[in-house]
Amino acid sequence: VGTRVVVDPLMGPGDMLGTNRSGAYAEYVVVPATNVFPIPDTLGFEEAAALPTVYQAEDVQPHDFDTDRPYLTYTADGETHRLDCDFIAGCDGFHGSSRQAIPEQVRTEYEKTYPFGWLGILSETPPVDHELIYANSERGFALCSMRNANLSRYYIQCALSDRPEDWEDDTFWTELKRRLPEDTAEKLVTGPSIEKSIAPLRSFVCEPMRWGRLFLCGDAAHIVPPTGAKGLNTAASDVHYLYHGMVAHYQDGESEGLDRYSETALKRIWKTQRFSWSMTNLLHRFPEQSEFDLHVQAAELAFLAENEAAQRALAENYVGLAY
């Protein structure tokens, strides 16, 4: 499948601009956005290889992964099925069964929660800009992004106690405009939302990411706050390391890649966690922030806007560290 990846970049010039208005500091960070590959390509590969795909499976459970004969059980169409495996890749998300199957006495979980969420809407409106916009204002964080020429997604920082139904569309648009510079707010095209949700923010890592023949990938092993846009990127790096480990195992009879999977993946994950955590601290307003904290935050934003080396470091981390 990797040889058929279709890349459709929405490239920007990579500028970073800072605007100081009415005592509020708004920061723009502009980076390329890339669609990895369309789902039909993956489905076409499965069809060509005559591989069965089971959708809507329930109660998926890994078994005996500490032996050389692991297997999965799952329920589909009202019947229980068994799938014998060489290895199990646990790609079932934060709430899946894979991580929980690793014994508690060998599993260490690190977690940090944040005192706010992101209220996001999707609207069939042209984007306010073809570039991604991050804004840190005295009223809190805001993000403007495009899905296509007539579909936009916007986010604002909100209280964890808020509910989507608490926010009428007009209230959301008014608050978003307040968090953007006037010239940007004036260009904002508003309209009815077609989707509205609130996402809490957390940082999470599980160690190890391998136990026996069970390998954790993506959200099953780690969560990052969306500020750094590293969730899918980090999941892809996990799959990269696991894929190459399996290729070496099956083609060359080597086990080093699989044996070192957890160690290798975690080195990159913690760097990604650091970046996502730092971006979250940089761009949000925290309830406990002092005037000193706010001045340091503003100074960091100004430094990023003015210093090319800092911009390069941010861009390298935002696009994704090499793997």
Residue map of PLM features:
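NAD(P)H dinucleotide-binding glycine-rich loop of Rossmann-like/cofactor-binding domains
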Residues: 8-58
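Conserved FAD-binding catalytic core of PHBH/FMO-like flavoproteins
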Residues: 60-201, 206
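Active-site flanking residues adjacent to catalytic metal/cofactor-binding acidic residues
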Residues: 91, 218-219, 237
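Catalytic P-loop NTPase motifs of RecA-like helicase/translocase cores
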Residues: 97-98, 223-225
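FAD-binding beta-loop-beta segment adjacent to the flavin cofactor pocket
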Residues: 200-216, 220
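A conserved FAD-binding loop/helix module that cradles the flavin
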Residues: 226-236
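C-terminal helical "tail/cap" subdomain of flavin- and related membrane-associated enzymes
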Residues: 227-229, 244-323
